[in-house]
Amino acid sequence: MFSKILVANRGEIAIRVMRACRELGIKSVAVYSEADKNALFTRYADEAYEIGKPAPSQSYLRIDRILEVAEKAGAEAIHPGYGFLAENPRLGEECEKQGIKLIGPKGSVIEAMGDKITSKKLMKKAGVPVIPGTDQGVSDPDEAARIADSIGYPVIIKASAGGGGIGMRAVYEEDELIRAMESTQSVAASAFGDPTVYIEKYLERPRHIEFQVMADESGNVIHLADRECSIQRRHQKLIEEAPSPIMTPELRERMGSAAVKAAEYIGYENAGTVEFLYSNGDFYFLEMNTRIQVEHPITEVITGVDLVKEQIRVASGEELRFTQKDINIRGHAIECRINAENPLADFAPNPGKITGYRSPGGIGVRVDSGVYMNYEIPPFYDSMISKLIVWGMDRQEAINRMKRALSEYIILGVKTTIPFHKAIMRNEAFRRGELHTHFVDEYRRGIDAEMRKIVKEDQEMVERLQSTFLPSKKVAAISAAIGTYMHSRRG
């Protein structure tokens, strides 16, 4: 087992990994940018080192600086979290050169699955269902028109190197095709440095269902059931739940077997997620995320498996401690991503200072966060404030518990997505489990109307509770005391 791990990330996921390290008796090392010098994760770590200016390109994406710190601190392994360098194959290559273990799959696997065309070809060879379309890049408009005609409109044009919903464009008629191709190629070149695009059949109302997989270095692979991620905006997830409301034992067997087959075929190691689109009884491979996912806590809650600790164990050379038969699902879990965004302004980012903060609690409630009262949310990174996770004996109890937890969650000073989540929990179609990836767009008018009502209700509640928030001088004193405590823990 490792004695010291460097966490090459920030915010809540950095703290999440550090907690796992602490439970395993492993020292943790934080790296941080100038903008994060007062961030909670830097104080939670046993050691912390500044690595550059606020821009990710000058800090969290600096492989050279991160490896310098790893060597200086004596870290034997690096956990990349999610985002930043988590799916950059070069990090693994550089770690290998320095004799440092990257907690994740091999660089060649990251590279193969990070390219949508390559991954689709591999999945076809593995016998995993894929969406009808091309399995090579398309640049000629005439060829694109022939392909679109053969598979039938609507089609979707995707960037081969894309991810996070960036570089995707649906096309409903041939007249739109050339313009859509040019636009997608331009976005792909700008965002990913690769203008290659491909074409697939566009599924208009699919569900987004993914399977968590875990594999060790001896070739043992299992799945830890499914997650439903259909509540999205601009192809980016907002709410996840486990298991999927439509999942049956038979469907889980089929989809889970396909996910395991995918991981086995590419020689996968560590934690990963195989994502599918589900439509009219059929499912199709979408992509594989070669890292821990933002939404991993809901899988932990329903299975009782600490995925991050298992990542560390597997990376240290241990075999999986359980088989597929050992994985049992208990109850239902929901996760709401609490972002510093204005949901009534098309989810525009809203960084700033948190002037009031009270997180929810009670049975079946978990908050993964990296913020605190008077914390300044920097504008340079993802807008996530926290992840609110609840568990219930069944889906209905989980929804009601989430409603209660959201009603307790108070964040002042910045606009957040809390009103959006409250509106979704009240939505009858959501409560019935009638989900698809265009749910938010379809019910937008009703959701917006409900949010406006909620914002007014929340404002009245906050005014009544203002006295519960401590004066800033007392907060500063408490923060200093917490800082002293955290530093004393490093000894």
UniProtKB/Swiss-Prot annotation:
ATP binds at residues 116, 200, 235. PROSITE patterns: ATP_GRASP, BC, CPSASE_1, CPSASE_2. One of its GO terms (biological process) is gluconeogenesis. Pathway: Carbohydrate biosynthesis; gluconeogenesis. Residues 120-316 form the ATP-grasp domain. Residues 1-445 form the Biotin carboxylation domain. The keyword Metal-binding applies. Optimum pH is 8. GO terms for molecular function: ATP binding; metal ion binding; pyruvate carboxylase activity. Keywords: ATP-binding, Gluconeogenesis, Ligase, Magnesium, Metal-binding, Multifunctional enzyme, Nucleotide-binding, Pyruvate. Optimum temperature is 60 degrees Celsius. Its EC number is 6.4.1.1. Pyruvate carboxylase catalyzes a 2-step reaction, involving the ATP-dependent carboxylation of the covalently attached biotin in the first step and the transfer of the carboxyl group to pyruvate in the second. This is Pyruvate carboxylase subunit A.
